[in-house]
């Protein structure tokens, strides 16, 4: 039976949106495994816009949903429409958009909040005990979704791991090619570009994450 998987994007571009490589690798693996995918994003303004050639902030405003549609080839919906009962699993790629648009973790660290529509959607999967995959920096959302005690990884960055621990998560160090699973909560995480030095290194862990998330839907 074909599995239906929701993917929440956070814009388009590593410095101010969804990490494009991570997003495409996840979407490709889902397609290779025969899953039916629907992309979602919050219909809100980005925190800011970054020139990806220089790293400088640009004097303009962009919409997270509109930018995410670039990755989704236009096939995208407002995350307000995302209901866990319509899907078997959820995956959230990383990129600074997860920490600037889906949440304010990049600014507020352990005292961050998650965008309300994103939080409601993700908690729906947690409450339904359906599998969730969080990639790269998006495990920063884990404690807000699941509460204290959730196990997850962002690789081995001490500062970020400390912030996750302060939020109530149990951080587990992880190689770029591996995954960490919280079996009780059906949460799977992988470091991807928190550690990856190439797209193939990122793909190694993301492919394992997608495969495991799909296994957990059975």
Language model features with spans:
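A short, charged/proline- and glycine-enriched loop
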Residues: 1-3
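Glycine/small-residue-rich loop that forms an oxyanion/phosphate-binding "nest" at active or ligand-binding sites
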Residues: 59-75, 80-85
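N-terminal beta-loop-helix "entrance" segment that forms/cooperates
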Residues: 40-65
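Active-site-adjacent pocket-lining segments in enzyme domains
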Residues: 6-38, 75-218
């Amino acid at each position: 039976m074909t599995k239906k998987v929701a993917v929440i994007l956070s814009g388009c571009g590593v410095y101010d949106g969804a990490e494009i490589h991570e997003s495409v690798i996840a979407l490709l693996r889902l397609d290779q495994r025969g899953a039916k995918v629907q992309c979602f994003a919050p219909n809100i303004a980005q925190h800011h816009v970054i020139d990806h050639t220089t790293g400088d902030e640009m004097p303009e405003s962009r919409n997270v949903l509109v930018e995410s549609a670039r990755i989704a080839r236009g096939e995208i919906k407002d995350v307000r429409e995302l209901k866990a009962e319509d899907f078997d699993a959820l995956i959230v790629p990383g990129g600074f958009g997860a920490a600037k648009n889906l949440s304010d973790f990049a600014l507020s660290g352990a005292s961050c909040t998650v965008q309300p529509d994103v939080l409601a959607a993700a908690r729906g999967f947690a409450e339904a005990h359906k599998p969730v995959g969080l990639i790269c920096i998006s495990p920063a959302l884990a404690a807000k979704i699941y509460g204290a005690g959730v196990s997850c990884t962002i690789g081995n960055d001490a500062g970020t791991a400390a912030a996750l621990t302060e939020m109530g998560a149990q951080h587990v160090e992880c190689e770029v090619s591996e995954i960490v699973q919280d079996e009780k909560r059906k949460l799977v995480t992988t470091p991807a570009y928190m550690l990856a030095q190439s797209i193939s290194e990122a793909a190694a862990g993301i492919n394992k994450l997608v495969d495991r998330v799909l296994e957990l839907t059975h």
